[in-house]
Regions:
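Conserved class I S-adenosyl-L-methionine
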Residues: 1-37, 51-52, 70-73, 146-152, ...
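C-terminal alpha-helical "lid/dimerization" subdomain adjacent to the S-adenosyl-L-methionine
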Residues: 19-21, 133-189
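Nucleotide donor/acceptor-binding cores
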Residues: 39-41
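Class I SAM-dependent methyltransferase SAM/SAH-binding core
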Residues: 43-91
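A short acidic, Gly/Pro-enriched loop at the edge of an enzyme's catalytic core
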Residues: 90-101
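A short SAM/SAH-binding and catalytic strip from SAM-dependent methyltransferases
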Residues: 101-113
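C-terminal lobe and adjacent flexible extensions of AdoMet/dcAdoMet transferase-like proteins
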Residues: 191-196
Length: 196
């Protein structure tokens, strides 16, 4: 992640409670899915202010973020099964096959190189490990025009308004297990993948 993007998210940290409130229904579904699985090692990339941390019921969680300020806030929600680290998801400092589960909650469209992020996730996941991606995805309906119109502003806030998951080569190495759509326009989705 570039210094400019990193700096932006440090400053943006004060607005995360509002963002979390807006995204709560989606995140509730995400954690319903995650918590149904057997206890395992879970990596939360872009843990942000740690709002998700209390929602993990049984997993050993490692949360990473590039924002020191966000991690400082997250540390107040810390509990003994969570390890928080300052790290870039596009350059993970973990060995191969370390995690049973990886969560990307509204992260993949804000990193500089989504392809590199997914490659790193593939590397650190164990065989049969699960990847959970909760994000907006540019749909093939009228909202596509909104995404395209929003591109210039989106760049200023370090966000890819136009985002197609199928354009990522590495995602094709995973098997899509489930797709959950939110709202009538299906702008937000939860995609659950499995590493072979």
């Amino acid at each position: 992640m570039s210094r400019q993007t990193h700096s932006f998210y440090n400053k943006f940290s004060v607005f995360y409670p509002l963002v979390d409130f807006f995204l709560r229904p989606q995140k509730t579904r995400l954690f319903d899915e995650v918590n149904q699985l057997p206890a395992g090692n879970l990596l939360d990339i872009g843990v942000g202010n740690g709002a998700n941390l209390p929602l993990y019921k049984k997993h050993r969680v490692t949360g990473i973020d590039t924002s020191f300020e966000m991690l400082s806030i997250a540390s107040k929600r810390y509990h003994k099964q969570v390890r928080l680290l300052l790290m870039n998801g596009e350059d993970l400092l973990f060995g191969d096959g370390q995690f049973d589960y990886v969560v990307l909650s509204h992260v993949i469209a804000v990193v500089d190189n989504p392809e590199q992020l997914v490659e790193e996730v593939f590397r650190v996941l164990k065989p049969n490990g699960r990847l959970f991606i909760l994000n907006h995805f540019t749909p093939n309906n009228w909202l596509k025009q909104v995404d395209f119109a929003f591109r210039i502003f989106a760049r200023m806030v370090h966000f890819k308004s136009v985002f197609y998951i199928h354009e990522l080569t590495t995602i094709r190495r995973f098997k899509l297990l489930k797709e959950v759509r939110f709202g009538s326009a299906s702008y937000f989705k939860l995609l659950i993948y499995q590493k072979p």
